[in-house]
Amino acid sequence: MVMDKLGSSLQDALKKLVGAGRIDEKTVTEVVKDIQRALLQADVNVKLVMQMSSHIKERALKEEVPPGMNPREHVIKIVYQELISIVGRSADIPLKPQTIMMIGLQGSGKTTTTSKLSRYFQRKGLKPAVICADTFRPGAYQQLKTLCDKLNVPFYGEVGNPDAVGIVERGLAELGKNDVLIVDTAGRHSLEADLIDEMEQIHEIAQPDYKLLVLDGAIGQQASEQARAFNDSVGISGVVISKLDGTAKGGGALSAVSETNSAIAFIGVGETPDDLEKFEPDRFISRLLGMGDIKSLIEKAEETLSEEDIDMEAMMRGRFTLKDMYSQLEAMNKMGPMKQIMQMLPLGGMGAKLSDDAYKVTEDKMKGYRVLMDSMTEEELLNPRLLGSSRIKRISLGSGSSPDAVRELLKYYKMMQNAMKGLRGGKFNIQKMMKKMGM
């Protein structure tokens, strides 16, 4: 998950509201203090934290609770809205032909982000191409070329040529027929005069529609100074916060965006080419607070899965079979790591509480279930009631497993079957919950 520790701390703070008999000033003050502590530990700017804390307390104690909402839900909604105000709006990078210039310091994850961005446009049906203008860092050309080759993205660069401006000029001519041209510029260990001069010359030649500053999610408080310097030099259209998965604090980068009045365009949430997400403030905060992110989950499923992969409507209408469960497991495997998928489900932050080891064990168990089902007949997959002791023994032998493993699979299947019945019966009214929060 993005910013695991911050998300867990914020969720713990809001739990105090659940146990409170009534929402009074003392309870609100305690919750606000816990939120302050969580944000400051994540490197969020002190001034921003204090402003937000004041707003939460004032609104929670003075605003009238809207009809259909209890006081606890109202305070949670206020926290949700005020956290969104900290991260600000999102920078909208449209899905159309354009030129994008990538800027940032060395080590920010700029080159990897460039390849991920090309993959993002590729997934959306556009034809991206990449120009390597980083002539400063040894290995930059080969790294970016390798990443682009794996994605079948057209690439232009010149090994050993220090003339970055000339490379960009020739690259634009060579790759101009593609929809989205992404120029990866050189980084430095600090914002030096020669880097600024080179960036300004490339900017003049490329005439980019958008300039994206890549900031390392773990950068801390110096992020604001960097963002201001780059903004003064060539201007910033948007920010990409990289390495925001796992333990990254992220608060410094988020503060930098707020202080420079810019906006976040994308966030890096993992190591694979597909782990770059368009930044949506409401969805980001929803995930942090353990409320899930159903919209992103649906979008990910639409991008990754075909209609044949999983037929949710059919499952919701009729019987849920082992064959349906097999399709579910296959679909989840295609959509990415289980940890990312779990964070998108509104499970009250349950996903955030699981350790990486727990996720690994769960993923291994799901793989084992698929192996067991591969040893079943079509008739057994469609009608699990047929699975008596003799069939269970045959399946365990055919899969190299034990009868107990088959019984564990059937127990999991029963649990999933009951969950589907609950969804059909409206026990988990996700839409109602999201509507209450204004999502």
Curated annotation (Swiss-Prot):
Top enzyme category: hydrolase
Coiled-coil annotated residue ranges, if any: none
GO molecular function: 7S RNA binding; ATP hydrolysis activity; GTP binding; GTPase activity
Keywords: Cytoplasm, GTP-binding, Hydrolase, Nucleotide-binding, Ribonucleoprotein, RNA-binding, Signal recognition particle
Domain of life: Archaea
Binding site for GTP: 104-111, 184-188, 242-245
Any one of the GO BP annotations: SRP-dependent cotranslational protein targeting to membrane
Catalysed reaction equations from the record: GTP + H2O = GDP + phosphate + H(+)
CDD domains in the record: SRP54_G
Complex and partners: Part of the signal recognition particle protein translocation system, which is composed of SRP and FtsY. Archaeal SRP consists of a 7S RNA molecule of 300 nucleotides and two protein subunits: SRP54 and SRP19.
Family the entry assigns: Belongs to the GTP-binding SRP family. SRP54 subfamily.
Summary of the function given for this chain in its UniProt record: Involved in targeting and insertion of nascent membrane proteins into the cytoplasmic membrane. Binds to the hydrophobic signal sequence of the ribosome-nascent chain (RNC) as it emerges from the ribosomes. The SRP-RNC complex is then targeted to the cytoplasmic membrane where it interacts with the SRP receptor FtsY.
Domain description: Composed of three domains: the N-terminal N domain, which is responsible for interactions with the ribosome, the central G domain, which binds GTP, and the C-terminal M domain, which binds the RNA and the signal sequence of the RNC.
HAMAP family: SRP54
Protein name: Signal recognition particle 54 kDa protein
Organism field: Methanococcoides burtonii (strain DSM 6242 / NBRC 107633 / OCM 468 / ACE-M)
